[in-house]
Amino acid sequence: GELEGEGPADRIPSHGDPGVGGGDVGQDAVEGCEHRLGEALIPDLGGCRIGDRPIDFHMDALRAFGAIVDKSYEGIRLTAPHGLHGANIELPYPSVGATEQVLLTAVLAEGVTELKNAAIEPEIMDLIAILQKMGAIINVEPNRVIFIEGVEKLDGYQHTALFDRNEAASWASAALATEGDIFVGGARQQELM
């Protein structure tokens, strides 16, 4: 479908609902709170129904940007008393979630960020396209290195969202298992490989 955005909201709540979360939901929304308010409180993250997902890559990346990360019974409190600044980050492996988080943090951080061993899945390239439409300065190198130059603000955008590759593969698997025929609208073959 079509997505439209008008840039950052005037008000962003500084904390999440502890009853919501506990999974990856919300991890990417943290950057907006931290950039706009200088702090964010989110429920403890780290998994979903599939299983646990370590978040230490995310926390280490936020620390590299200058954030202070405090874990407590309430959740994870992130503060940036001196703002967020560009960083040199190398991920232990090309994590999609960690790459998304670094991109979303770096676009509004002061200075240049170099991200090594970044994920380059179609969803990452689509996020980069959206951020560039909003005014972000991002350069993707062929060796999984991404350079992000922080900007003062992001603007609105229009973008056609990428289809869900997992959903398309699930439908294709169902058709194969049932020996049926199915058409998955919007799926692009080159991004399924």
Q: Which ranges hold each PLM region?
A:
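Short, structured segments at the rim of ligand-binding sites
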Residues: 1-19, 23, 29-193
